[in-house]
Amino acid sequence: MMTRLETLKNNLQATLGQDIALTEALGELTLEVPADQWLTVCNKLRTDAGLRFESCIDLCGMDYQTWGDGSHANAHDEPARPGRFAVVIHLLSIEHNWRLRVRTYAVDEEFPIVASLIECWPGVNWYEREAFDLYGIVFEGHPDLRRILTDYGFIGHPFRKDFPLSGTVEMRYDPEQKRVIYQPVTIDPREITPRIVRESSYGMGR
């Protein structure tokens, strides 16, 4: 008798083809989708009777610029990431009671673009705005793609790995101008804790 995870895997292969990039780890399935097929595949995931992922419960951006640098990740011989910026969604099928993680990578690192999924799941509207605000990922087809967390005049995207930890500008009230102004950040970066790279077997009971 097949497990629920095996049934989901078979249904995904039946709908999307046997050659889909599907990985299983820790009792979860992750589907990798090329950026140019992102919207098409997600529509199938939502509408196909054997899948029926009616709900997108989360969407986030990722920046893999420093992935594996000085960590134990390389010890596991993980393949190189196909791009710097990725979009990850977590889907829920209420009808079949199963979940799926889906990921796509933006092709252009300088100007990352991914199709908006509002057509599939209208509830991702603010999730996509958040990923745009924090990572600079542009969601093509989004009806109102503007910042949602940072200030209107904010420059840059604070969750990118190359964004300075102390920021670039700060706000203060200027008593002479009697208004809030921006000025270059006055905080001096200070590292007081050495970076520790743990051995590859750390936390694995070995």
From Swiss-Prot:
NDH-1 shuttles electrons from NADH, via FMN and iron-sulfur (Fe-S) centers, to quinones in the respiratory chain. The immediate electron acceptor for the enzyme in this species is believed to be ubiquinone. Couples the redox reaction to proton translocation (for every two electrons transferred, four hydrogen ions are translocated across the cytoplasmic membrane), and thus conserves the redox energy in a proton gradient. Belongs to the complex I 30 kDa subunit family. It comes from the Bacteria. The keyword DNA repair does not apply. It is an enzyme of class 7 (translocase). GO terms for cellular component: plasma membrane. Its EC number is 7.1.1.-. NDH-1 is composed of 14 different subunits. Subunits NuoB, C, D, E, F, and G constitute the peripheral sector of the complex. Pfam families: Complex1_30kDa. Keywords: Cell inner membrane, Cell membrane, Membrane, NAD, Quinone, Translocase, Transport, Ubiquinone. The lineage of its organism: Bacteria, Pseudomonadati, Pseudomonadota, Betaproteobacteria, Burkholderiales. It comes from Bordetella avium (strain 197N). This is NADH-quinone oxidoreductase subunit C. It is found in: Cell inner membrane. InterPro entries: NADH_DH_suC, NADH_quin_OxRdtase_su_C/D-like, NADH_UbQ_OxRdtase_30kDa_su, NADH_UbQ_OxRdtase_CS. GO terms for molecular function: NADH dehydrogenase (ubiquinone) activity; NADH:ubiquinone reductase (non-electrogenic) activity; quinone binding. SUPFAM superfamilies: Nqo5-like. Its main location: membrane. It catalyses: a quinone + NADH + 5 H(+)(in) = a quinol + NAD(+) + 4 H(+)(out). It is a peripheral membrane protein. Gene3D superfamilies: NADH:ubiquinone oxidoreductase, 30kDa subunit. Signal peptide: none annotated.
